[in-house]
């Protein structure tokens, strides 16, 4: 007998309605982030950089939360492929809105990158990996 795994997905979202509200908020936050910082990353003072990357992290964590929820729902019921595809497309669109952050960070001067890393030590590993991947 095959044992079916049951996940309690309520830790992520209690309902589809909550998921939809979260997605709306996530899209709005990503648009605001892009409006505030796209093309302007080089102008951000190093002491303000930590707050900017924290916003970026929150958006990425939101994407991860949504995709974890829909993936586990799909794993439980593979007839839900349309739901998975819907949210995968939406989260990809959200990620595309904020992708500039990584690209622009890699284009900063080495001195600016160093200052940003020093002002955001909790993100040093992530930022250093971005630089290494860009080389």
Predicted regions: what is each one?
Residues 1-135:
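A well-structured
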């Amino acid at each position: 007998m095959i044992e079916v795994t049951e996940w309690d997905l309520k830790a992520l979202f209690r309902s589809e309605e909550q998921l939809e509200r979260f997605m709306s908020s996530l899209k709005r936050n990503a648009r605001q982030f892009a409006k505030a910082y796209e093309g302007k990353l080089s102008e951000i003072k190093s002491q303000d950089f930590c707050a900017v990357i924290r916003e970026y992290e929150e958006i990425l964590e939101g994407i991860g939360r949504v995709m974890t929820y829909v993936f586990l729902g799909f794993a439980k019921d593979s007839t839900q492929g349309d739901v998975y595809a819907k949210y995968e497309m939406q989260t990809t669109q959200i990620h595309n809105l904020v992708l500039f952050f990584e690209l622009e960070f890699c284009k900063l001067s080495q001195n600016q990158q160093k200052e940003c890393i020093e002002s955001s030590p909790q993100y040093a590993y992530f930022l250093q990996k971005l630089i290494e991947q860009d080389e």
